[in-house]
């Protein structure tokens, strides 16, 4: 799956997910025209693409236990990507995002600069 999301789909996803946990971002990581063979692997790829874009655009920061993660955006993203589950079973109905194995959660940066810790 190379053509991840159209720009309007990305904006719709961000609008729907803003202020919510990364589990919500994963739930919304589906194209409007979902192929019949759409798999968790496809959803995972979209989620990671969206996460990286949100980080690079400054729309979210990653934090754990009330503290922002150390390192560059690239380092944080690579850390997250390296441990992100490869199967739906490993996500465990979204519980993985709240487990110690998850490197961090989303802190949304709103247009006015205020932060929403999710």
Pin down the residues of each PLM region.
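Short, amphipathic alpha-helical interaction segments positioned at domain boundaries
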Residues: 70-118
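Short amphipathic alpha-helical segments that mediate assembly, nucleic-acid/protein binding
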Residues: 6-10, 47, 73-77
């Amino acid at each position: 799956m190379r053509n991840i999301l159209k720009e309007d789909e990305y904006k719709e996803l961000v609008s729907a997910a803003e202020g919510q946990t990364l589990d919500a971002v994963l739930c919304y990581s589906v194209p409007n025209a979902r192929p019949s063979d759409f798999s968790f692997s496809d959803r995972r790829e979209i989620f990671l693409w969206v996460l990286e874009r949100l980080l690079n655009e400054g729309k979210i920061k990653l934090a754990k236990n009330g503290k922002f993660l150390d390192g560059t955006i690239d380092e944080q993203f690579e850390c997250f990507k390296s441990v992100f589950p490869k199967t739906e079973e490993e996500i465990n109905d979204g519980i993985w995002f709240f487990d110690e194995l998850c490197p961090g959660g989303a802190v949304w940066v709103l247009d006015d600069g205020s932060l929403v810790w999710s």
